[in-house]
Amino acid sequence: MDKCKHVGRLRLAQDHSILNPQKWHCVDCNTTESVWACLSCSHVACGRYIEEHALRHFQDSKHPLALEVNELYVFCYLCDDYVLNDNTTGDLKLLRSTLSAIKSQNYDCTTRSGRTLRSMVTADDSFISHEGAQAFLQNEDRAFTALWHRRHALLGKVFRSWFALTPKGKQRLEEERLREEAEQKREEARKKRQQLKRKLKEEMESTSPRKSSRLQHQIQPSPKTELPSVQKMNQKNSPTTKQKTPAPTSDKACFKKIGNSPIKRKPTVTPGVTGLRNLGNTCYMNSILQILSHLHVFRECFLQLDLNQTQELLAAAGSGKTRLSSKYPPGAELPRVTQKHTKVQRSLARRQSFSLGLSGGASNSRNMELIQPKEPSSKHISLCHELHTLFQVMWSGKWALVSPFAMLHSVWRLIPAFRGYAQQDAQEFLCELLDKVQQELETTGTRYPALIPTSQRKLIKQVLNVVNNIFHGQLLSQVTCLVCDHKSNTIEPFWDLSLEFPERYHFNGKETASQRPCLLTEMLAKFTETEALEGKIYACDQCNKAQKQLMVCRLPQVLRLHLKRFRWSGRNHREKIGVHVRFDQMLNMEPYCCRESTAALRADCFIYDLSSVVMHHGKGFGSGHYTAFCYNPEGGFWVHCNDSKLHSCTVEEVCKAQAYILFYTQRVTQENGHLSDTLPVHGSPQSPPR
């Protein structure tokens, strides 16, 4: 629509909620797909092709104009058309340029009049450095957790009241009453025994023991016996000569010991069932972090490893501020020196981490020394440290919601391609994140080994081994000449398998694809099928006709299956294949492995169990919303992770999801169960021997 009369009446507030990326999701269903912001108030909701929450808001409030947050379209509900014109003050143009600057984190663009809309996300690395905004959301996280706990407590109270009225509930109450009465009787009997024992002890202490005349005669001291001097008594009771006495066994001492012992609190929430706040189109990051935190081996490694102190020491050594004595050779370790001020370093790190986010900020101190460390000269960004801190919070059982400020801050610094609030691909983010974590572990473990204690070096090596091998598998690329039957084998590593859809699901324009669901086993069979090599791709002196086949020759501990739902349509457009892929809770990989591997491995090593699923909601590559299904081992149930909203679900619901990335965990691992060494491997299949 060229001209909409309702735009002329628009008066856009300068502090509109749309300027805060944390509000870029539907307030009702929490999706980030097709989100529309009302231009008359602060309401943000999803479009009519999702749940129609924005349309319902118009029907209730009669606010006609709304702006699509990601595509920046303006729609008028009264005119029932898209709006192309602007008001006299140019508010829509200014709003679009401001939102574009917020997405790209580029604030250099200004209007001709110099007028601008200020966002909560100000310059230099965003709102993460803004202590006020961070403290505000931390308080919101606490309030959300407290509200969640109160709701569950009230729900439990109502359920217990109802259950007490049922026949089974009455039976349970009667059993509990009898159990309490028996426990009370045992407690009374125990108190009587203690009282009798105490009374008996007092009587024995007040009554002098009876002795025979012979013993009394022997006890009398002779005239020559010398009493110990005061000096000898002091020497006997000194700490160097004083012997250990057994711990008191009286009831009073026992009760004191029990009272001082720490009591393990029952967790507020199930460990791992912690939501991650959407900080502005960060659903791709939240879904991947939930997946990684629910992988048991990966999580346990980063819960034990914290590279914060290690990187501070390495940074000090690299800048020449660490003083090393000449008595320590280059390969020596310094455990005593590094452990001398561990408590001071930890307290400083905790203090800075609390005030400046999970990864902290910067300091101007330039006097950091290894022997007597002061505040670090700068707070170094570490993805490993952020994973360690975030996993600790998520699996503490104390928080129902956490805002991953510092994790996003570290991603922006170390992976610039993901800087800003534009919508990103979860598969690309997972690959980049694992690559950066691997590089960080390799760099930290090899720089200045003398500064790192032996235990820390071993732990870094173990975690690096897990990161390298947990998703690592090997493919056998076998090229067979159809004339001379020569086979050329090449071993290729892989960290995930990208599976293409069969040809019947690739359609153009308005054609409709087959409505029959695709099978995951069919996609795996297509991946490992034999393909003919045409032309002179395979250079042989005698013949050129050949065929190629990919087969798995080494299975990873965690199998990542990436379903290639997005394909190019035209030059600059990528469309989504929205067909449902049918997958099972158990996957047998034996049909897709080479025969030599089948002969060496146990049958259980081919069996994989479904552990996590990443879903993409939406129709396009550059838009949509990511959620994840994760199996929680602490509670023994599946959890649907939709940013801050988490709820339990059944495995049947998981298998009905429109999967984008599937994670399968190997049921039985066998490190040496592959035959890649027994296969004839050639560096290049294009030049086989005669």
Swiss-Prot record:
Residues 206-223, 231-248 have a biased composition (Polar residues). Its main location: nucleus. Residues 274-667 form the USP domain. Zn(2+) 2 binds at residues 26, 29, 46, 53. It holds the Pfam family zf-UBP. GO terms for molecular function: cysteine-type deubiquitinase activity; zinc ion binding. Disulfide bonds: none annotated. GO terms for cellular component: cytoplasm; nucleus. Residues 185-253, 321-340 are annotated as: Disordered. One of its GO terms (biological process) is proteolysis. InterPro entries: Papain-like_cys_pep_sf, Peptidase_C19_UCH, Ub_carboxyl-term_hydrolase, USP_CS, USP_dom, Znf_RING/FYVE/PHD, Znf_UBP. Transmembrane segments: none annotated. The active site is at residues 283, 625. Zn(2+) 1 binds at residues 4, 6, 76, 79. It catalyses: Thiol-dependent hydrolysis of ester, thioester, amide, peptide and isopeptide bonds formed by the C-terminal Gly of ubiquitin (a 76-residue protein attached to proteins as an intracellular targeting signal). This is Ubiquitin carboxyl-terminal hydrolase 44-A. It comes from Xenopus laevis. The gene is usp44-a.
